[in-house]
Amino acid sequence: MADTACLALRLLAALREEEARAVEELLRLGADPNLVLDDGAAAVHLAARASHPRALHCLRMLLRWGADPNARSAEGLTPVHVAAAWGCCGALELLLSRGGDPTLRDQDGLRPLDWALQQRHHNCARVLQELDTPTQPDETREPTETFHVAQGSFETETCQGPALAESSGVSQDSELHVHRAELEVEAVEVAVHPQSSEATENSDYSSDASFVTAVEDSLQPGRPGGALELVAGLWVTRGAVSAGKGAPNCQPQVLTLTARDTDKPVLPGDGDLGALHPHSSVPPMSDLQLLQALRALGYSPGPVTPFTRGHYLRRLQEAQASRADVGHSQELAEALRTGTIPDCQVDEEALAQCFQRLDPLKKWREGITKSSFTYLLLDPRLTKDLPARASSLTLAECLQCFVRAIFYVGKGTRARPDAHLWEAFGYHDQPRKQVCPKVRRILDIWASGRGIISLHCFQHVVAMEAYTREACLLDALGLQTLTNQKQGHYYGVVAHWPPSRRRRLGVHLLQRALLVFLAEGERELRPQDIQARG
């Protein structure tokens, strides 16, 4: 662990000096760019402040070596937050192009756009606001031809000759070649508008090949409409070389696609991406709404661009068509369908272990007193006294009923165990006041004559552990199915796990909470119960 922290500290020092060679060497030695250090941030957060070419090169290198553009600092900040807050538009565009999520909020509930507006970085704000701009409906767009490009690299080939130079306006000394360039986007669709028939008729071709040139494109701050420019840009020229004596025969094999670490030029995961603008039942939505809808279904999409929008729309349509219980994560949907719970006991032990012996001399969120817990609010109108009925139901049926009744997940303390109910009690006799969705649901249950089921789980832990367990449960359940208004915060080792692993742990924790509920029985809290306690 000491060696890991030492490497991470040396990586921070190299980034401050913008020494690209030292950064690369440390990454080769195993330095973790996502490791949150004592100051509460990781190397990728420091690199997100890149504002000129050398610093951007270091950031690009970190991302290439596995830096997470959505890694959380101790305060819940992601590199996208940092770039927006510092006004580093080039870094912001780069992070977004590598999967940075502009919808994530920090521990204060602020998005990257909120930071950009607060700090008056209008160029960054413009980039982020474009993500929430409704796009043109599919029916109004011109038909396109699409090329499907897999993650991989272009092999260099050369085709040169006098006839080519004469027909294209390129000097005889130049070469038409394809640079070897990494494509860092998982799946890209390149739309090519066909030439007009008039242009076709007036041209004499000796070959009908299309030439694709991949050019390394450095991201430029303030580029118009450049909110999500790709690092490896693709320029596509539809056309061919004029015939002439001695003209070389440039065949289509000039372009060779080679997928990384494989012999087949296939897309990772999906294969064919489908049409760029599929005709579907999905209603018109902005790019941000599309991102949020996919995240609610348990996906972790990258940025929505003109290249990827069609793919994400199709994925959303398929998910909505195939899943009756839209909103839950894939992992929870599988558990609800089969009753099979992921075996994550080892992961839960790892989560708890990292909070067992915290250094009391360091500053931790809400201290190190083990007085916190995670709680679930349930609607008794949906549980229908599940503990009494459980013996006649299967595990899958019990879990389905339990999950359907959960409407809020939170973190509480022994000092204020029912703070959420006290909040709702303050509005009990004032129905006309505007309230949040959680309070509205509580008041609705009380108005029906029933009480709230407040299930306390995973008790006697430090606040950061309770927050982490809460975040796992939220990701497994999906915000769309709850009255929670923001994602949770991860701390410790879980902060560095992939989203799918966190969601599996969330399903495991849900099943443990269900067992607590079945053992304790169903108890309702009505307004008079809250008043009596007060």
From Swiss-Prot:
Q: State the Gene Ontology terms under molecular function.
A: endonuclease activity
A single GO cellular-component term on record: nucleoplasm
E.C. number: 3.1.-.-
Q: Which InterPro entries match?
A: ANKLE1, Ankyrin_rpt, Ankyrin_rpt-contain_sf, GIY-YIG_endonuc, LEM/LEM-like_dom_sf, LEM_dom
Key words of the record: ANK repeat, Cytoplasm, DNA damage, DNA repair, Endonuclease, Hydrolase, Nuclease, Nucleus, Repeat
Q: What does the record list as GO biological process?
A: negative regulation of mitotic recombination; protein export from nucleus; regulation of lymphoid progenitor cell differentiation; regulation of myeloid progenitor cell differentiation
Q: Which residues form the GIY-YIG domain?
A: 370-485
Signal peptide position in this chain?
none
At the top of the EC hierarchy, this enzyme's class is hydrolase
PANTHER family tied to this protein? ANKYRIN REPEAT AND LEM DOMAIN-CONTAINING PROTEIN 1
What does the domain comment read? The LEM domain is required for GIY-YIG domain-mediated DNA cleavage and induction of DNA damage response.
Q: Give the function comment from the record.
A: Endonuclease that probably plays a role in the DNA damage response and DNA repair.
Report what the protein is called. Answer: Ankyrin repeat and LEM domain-containing protein 1
The gene designation is: Ankle1
